[in-house]
Amino acid sequence: SAMGFRTRDAAKAFKNAIELGAEPMYSQAGPMELNIPAIKGIGGMPIFLVDRDIYENDFIFFDDVEKNPRGAGLNEIDHLTHNVYKGRMDYWANFYEKIFNFQEIRYFDIKGEYTGLTSKALTAPDGMIRIPLNEDSDKGNGQIAEFLADFNGEGIQHIAFITDDLVSTWDKLKGLGLKFMTPPPET
């Protein structure tokens, strides 16, 4: 997986991130591909830094195509939840605070009979990017540990979207063939 942040000046943002301690990631661009600066994020995932629409050179709309279609009703990303190993939540919170000037806006300590987790919710300075960081509670055998085992380490657990009409969006996505997870049984 990968993630990208849009910035005014990708080269400058990359240089600043490296100076602040981020680890650079380099890729070999193929013919007709762009070399996009990236730093190493959670689970070794690249965080690309872009300063323009990287697709504007590759795609030109036909005259009769809607340039901003309504789609299924997913308006924007609300948050990207990251699951991390026990004891690594503060490390990654500091990473986002130091490199991108994020701020912690909420802390949760969720305790359950069988599972529990702690979470720090971070937001970008403009409030447009929200990243909750989750780690297992002291029990260490809950949903976070299960995710880390199933997906071979730290990473994005889920992406939440904002919609004006959840039921309509659900119906449209289902009609387009999207498969939904089976909800857990009620207890």
Predicted regions and their residues:
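Vicinal oxygen chelate
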Residues: A2-D78, H82-V84, R106-S137, F161, ...
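Amphipathic alpha-helical segments
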Residues: N16-L20, M89-Q103
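Short hydrophobic/aromatic-rich motifs at helix boundaries and adjacent loops
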Residues: V65-E66, W92, N141-G142
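Short amphipathic alpha-helical segments, especially helix-boundary/capping motifs
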Residues: N68-G71, Y96-E97, Q143-F147
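Extended non-catalytic domains of envelope/secretory-pathway proteins
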Residues: K86, A93, D150-F151, G155
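Aromatic side chains
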Residues: F95-Y96, F102, F147, F180, ...
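Flexible internal linker/loop segments at domain or repeat junctions
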Residues: E135-G153
